[in-house]
Design a protein with these regions (language model features):
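Conserved GNAT acetyl-CoA-binding A-motif
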Residues: 104-118
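A short, internal acetyl-CoA/4′-phosphopantetheine-binding micro-motif in the GNAT/acyltransferase core
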Residues: 81-90, 117-118, 149
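Acetyl-CoA-dependent GNAT
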Residues: 26-81
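A short beta-loop-alpha structural element at the N-terminal edge
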Residues: 7-22
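Conserved acetyl-CoA-binding loop of GNAT-fold acetyltransferases
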Residues: 129-139
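Conserved acetyl-CoA-binding loop-helix of GNAT-fold acetyltransferases
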Residues: 84, 90-107, 126-130
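C-terminal "cap" of GNAT-fold acetyltransferases
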Residues: 138-149
Length: 149
């Protein structure tokens, strides 16, 4: 668990599914498109998988006053994704979530951490550059890669 100026960061647990679902439900269509590469409305079942079966991933949450304002998941292959509630963006929450995912990857012996995003997801690209990811830009997607080993 990590805390920074009113934000608590911790591994998600089974009781968090509703808060994560509410977080995703608060997102605009554009935000959902940036996160999933499609206009994808996440289901309760998909959210429950994030917090009930950790066999192939680890999910962490950012919490302020018992409200989940950010969620990040890293899979065992090193790929990760995250989302921060629109009202809490540009406060370092996304950056801190990625730093935590990098620590988790190191503990699991994952040598390469990566993200895929769309070219107009400037916040994610900015976080990647700030944290030392190599950024490869194509016209359809951006790949961020960080070698840990």
């Amino acid at each position: 668990m990590s805390v920074s100026i009113g934000v608590t960061y911790r591994q998600a647990n089974s009781e968090d599914w509703k808060g994560i679902y509410d977080l995703y439900s608060s997102l605009s269509q554009e935000d959902l498109y940036l996160r999933f590469f499609s206009f994808h409305k996440i289901s309760e079942e998909e959210v429950k998988k994030l917090v009930l079966d950790f066999s192939d991933h680890t999910t962490v949450v950012a919490v302020i006053n018992n409200l989940i304002v950010g969620e990040a998941t890293i899979f065992n292959d090193g790929e990760f994704a995250l989302v921060v509630h629109p009202s809490y963006r540009r406060q370092g929450i996304g950056t801190e979530l990625v730093k935590i995912l990098i620590k988790i990857a190191k503990l699991k012996g994952i040598c390469k951490v990566k993200f895929y995003t769309l070219p107009d997801n400037y916040p994610m690209i900015r976080i990647g550059k700030k944290l030392g990811f190599k950024i490869k830009e194509d016209e359809d997607e951006v790949i961020g890669l960080l070698n840990l080993c």
